[in-house]
């Protein structure tokens, strides 16, 4: 099968694919695009954003901004006031958030409650914990993972996009990104669901903290560079080896 035959096959059989990049021996050897996309266009990678945020946490760990993923979440939010009667939140660690084993007081993702607030990190912390305690059960979350990017800001004093640009994107040749904030709920929905090409943006809250569970826009080429980075054990970006191994 030649390139044109493959292009036609994917265009007919896989309408959701917009870009493909292939590497061999660390070198890009094949690219193609569909659905009006160009090579440098980005798309909303949705929940794959979680994996990128996990890498940023690993970088912060290597830099000593975070001491351990076993640290309690509240250690990094000393100004946060825990509500009366809440006990579980004190025991929740960064690892609980990263592995989707943190308990919450809500069922499902509280999109409206978090995204209509002025401080998404604080609102997410308000929902962390609950009466059931830490059960160790898998509990998939998207919105409330905002705590992780809030934690990055607490430790680095850099917004999510600035931290990513400086310590992840720049070193491996990914274009600098900027914040994108939706003024209305409709604009928010349009951003998350629209499949048309996007630019180099990261969705953020009113305080310019990037969303941790969704919202990052990358091209297939960008994602391939991150994949090569992981295969190269974090070089040239400095990442803790055991952290990479756990993520993989």
Role assignments for model-derived ranges:
Residues 39-40, 107-185, 209-218:
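Catalytic-site signature segments of enzymes, centered on catalytic residues
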Residues 32, 122-130, 197-207:
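The feature captures the short pre-catalytic strand/loop hairpin that immediately precedes
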Residues 238-248:
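Acidic, glycine-rich loop-and-strand cores that form catalytic or ligand-binding grooves
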Residues 44, 76, 82-132:
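Extended ligand-binding groove/face enriched in aromatic
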Residues 63-102, 155-213:
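Active-site helix/loop module of the DD-peptidase/beta-lactamase fold
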Residues 48-54, 91, 141-145, 220-223:
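Short alpha-helical patches at coil-to-helix transitions and adjacent helical residues
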Residues 26, 44-69, 97, 148-152, ...:
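Active-site SXXK
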Residues 7-38, 69:
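A short, well-structured edge-of-sheet supersecondary motif
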């Amino acid at each position: 099968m030649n390139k044109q035959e493959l292009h036609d096959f994917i265009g007919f059989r896989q309408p959701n694919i917009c870009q493909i990049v292939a590497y061999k021996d660390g070198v890009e050897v094949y690219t193609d695009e569909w659905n009006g996309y160009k090579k440098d266009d980005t798309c909303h990678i949705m929940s794959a954003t979680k994996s990128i945020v996990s890498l940023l946490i690993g970088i912060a760990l290597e830099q000593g901004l975070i001491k351990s993923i076993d640290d309690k979440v509240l250690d990094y939010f000393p100004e946060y006031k825990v509500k009366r009667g809440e006990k579980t939140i004190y025991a929740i660690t960064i690892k609980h958030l990263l592995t989707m084993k943190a308990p919450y007081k809500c069922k499902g993702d509280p999109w409206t409650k978090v995204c209509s607030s002025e401080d998404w990190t604080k609102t997410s912390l308000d929902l962390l914990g609950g009466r059931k305690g830490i059960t160790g059960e898998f509990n998939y979350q998207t919105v409330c993972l905002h705590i992780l990017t809030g934690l990055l800001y607490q430790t680095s004093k850099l917004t999510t996009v600035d931290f990513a640009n400086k310590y992840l994107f720049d070193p491996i040749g990914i274009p600098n990104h900027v914040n994108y904030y939706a003024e209305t709920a409709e604009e928010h929905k349009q951003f998350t669901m629209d499949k048309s090409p996007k630019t180099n943006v990261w969705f953020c809250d009113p305080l310019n903290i990037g969303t941790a569970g969704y919202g990052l826009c990358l091209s297939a080429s960008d994602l391939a560079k991150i994949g090569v980075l992981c295969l190269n054990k974090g070089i040239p970006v400095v990442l803790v080896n055991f952290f990479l191994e756990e993520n993989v």
